Amino acid sequence: MSETSVSETAVTEKKPYQKPYTVGEEIFNSVTHGVGALLSIAGTVLVIVFAAINRGPMEVVTGSLFGASLIILYTMSTLYHALTNPTAKKVFQILDHNTIFLLIAGTYTPYTLCCIKPVWLGWTIFGCIWGAAVLGIVFSSISLEKFRKLSTFCYILMGWGIIFAIKPLKDGMPKFSLIMLVLGGVLYSLGCIFYVKKSIKYFHSIWHIFVVGGSLLHWFSVFWAIGMPVE
């Protein structure tokens, strides 16, 4: 290999990874998750207020964590797709992927600490999920491209891991809340089909729609689980 080839390769490797999105796609991506961020702020306020009125401190705290994870995810995603500076875009691309792990753990939090009994089981699942989220964030931060497929697998595995505690979860939450939880998980999972095929034009944008839909259903699930009065 010539010195010129080596030099060109080195420069190429140092360039930030750029997704092949068109301007139209990036506008759509930014708008959809910008709307998601605004809805998340409103939804978080509602969960906190109703949890404070109808339930207790634990519901308020866990609802706040769930809402914060939604707001952070949608904000990071919106900024990532809106930015044009290559260096800034690379940084927010990593943050965008890391917040997926944050959202999964944040979504688990109200269910594990407010719904699942016995209490030790809920706290155990809570610890495992947040531990897995931290590991996922570390690996994605080290090399987003190297661990991309592994990260996608972990998203799905972590998301559906709750089925191993489905009986105590079912016993500790309203039926409507459980239905919304499952349907939200289905939407997220179907969206992953478009996520892994994002090289096709507008498929990543479709993934964004599935994410908004899935998180909306999960918001209803959490709201009914910790914001409504206990029957």
Regions found by a protein language model. Give the residues of each.
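Multi-pass alpha-helical transmembrane bundles in non-GPCR membrane proteins
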Residues: 2-231
